[in-house]
Amino acid sequence: MAESFSFDVVSDFERQELVNTLDQVKREISQRYDLKGTDTVVDLDKENIFITTNSELTLNSVNDIIRQKAIKRNLSLKIFDYGEIETVSGNKLKQTILLKQGIKQEIAKKISKSIRDQFKKINVSINGETLRVSSKSKNDLQLAIKLISQLEESLNIPLKANNFR
């Protein structure tokens, strides 16, 4: 039997699911009657989604479609950080959606402190953009996972417990 048990806390998403989501969004944009002829373009790079269209109404519709498709593919809506709407090349509008990934240092410290305050026998170490939570008791770790899911709501970032050992 193992001496100590642990898990990692990460803020991550499945990139392929996001690609599939945006493929579905593009397909729906090309098929929906109210979005045909709007010259709407949805692009994805390493850490951003770019939406370019000709009206704010169309932009809001595309954002709604992205949210609906992301929910169906089990992507957290907390990964999307909507930027300002910019006017580009005359009458076009562009919005950049930043994709949140990784736990920032100050948020990691808050999570670590709240776990340590609740559970004295649990050790938390910060490893870059992840946290390693370890303890001799599986029950304490399961309670820590519940606490992390509660913290997820207040911190507004998607958190997952991985590598439970």
From Swiss-Prot:
User: Which InterPro entries did the record assign?
Assistant: DUF520, UPF0234-like_C, UPF0234_N, YajQ-like_sf
Q: What's this chain's function?
A: Nucleotide-binding protein.
**KW Metal-binding (keyword) present:** no
What's the name of the protein? Answer: Nucleotide-binding protein PMT9312_0481
Among Gene3D superfamilies, the record links this protein to: 3.30.70.860, YajQ-like, domain 2
Q: A single Gene Ontology molecular function, please?
A: nucleotide binding
Q: Which GO terms describe its cellular component?
A: cytosol
Q: Which top-level group of life is the source organism from?
A: Bacteria
Keywords recorded for this protein, A-Z: Nucleotide-binding
Q: Upper taxonomic classification of the species? A: Bacteria, Bacillati, Cyanobacteriota, Cyanophyceae, Synechococcales
The answer to keyword Protease applying to this record is no
- The coiled-coil regions, if any, are none
The family assignment reads: Belongs to the YajQ family.
Q: Which HAMAP family match?
A: YajQ (MF_00632)
Please name the source species: Prochlorococcus marinus (strain MIT 9312)
